[in-house]
């Protein structure tokens, strides 16, 4: 019977090419992790802003603003223009 040459020996790369491939994979993995971290950071930022907004709405729920205008996609978000002394003061950096 004839012996077949192994596929790995026919498609093997020089050691330096394999090292470059590993570097590219590690770079891509690092980029993917950075992208995921950026997305989580932005989601957390939005979450904090929403919590601050809800707390302000709860605190000032009995105060009627002078005018309310729709803002955002499909008018789902509302922005109330209030006198400066009525506006909620948030703690921390947003």
From Swiss-Prot:
Keywords: Cell membrane, Developmental protein, Membrane, Transmembrane, Transmembrane helix. Residues 28-59 are annotated as: Required for DVL/RTFL small polypeptide activity. It is found in: Cell membrane. The keyword Transmembrane helix applies. GO terms for biological process: negative regulation of cell population proliferation; shoot system development. It comes from the Eukaryota. The chain crosses the membrane at residues 63-82. Its main location: membrane. This is Small polypeptide ROTUNDIFOLIA LIKE 1.
């Amino acid at each position: 019977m004839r012996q077949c040459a192994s596929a790995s020996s026919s498609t093997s790369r020089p050691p330096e090419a394999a090292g470059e491939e590993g570097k590219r994979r590690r770079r891509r993995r690092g980029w993917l992790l950075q992208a995921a971290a950026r997305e989580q950071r932005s989601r957390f930022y939005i979450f904090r802003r929403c919590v601050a907004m809800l707390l302000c709405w709860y605190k000032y729920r009995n105060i009627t603003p002078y005018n309310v205008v729709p803002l955002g996609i499909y008018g789902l978000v509302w922005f109330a223009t209030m006198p400066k002394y009525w506006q909620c003061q948030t703690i921390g950096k947003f």
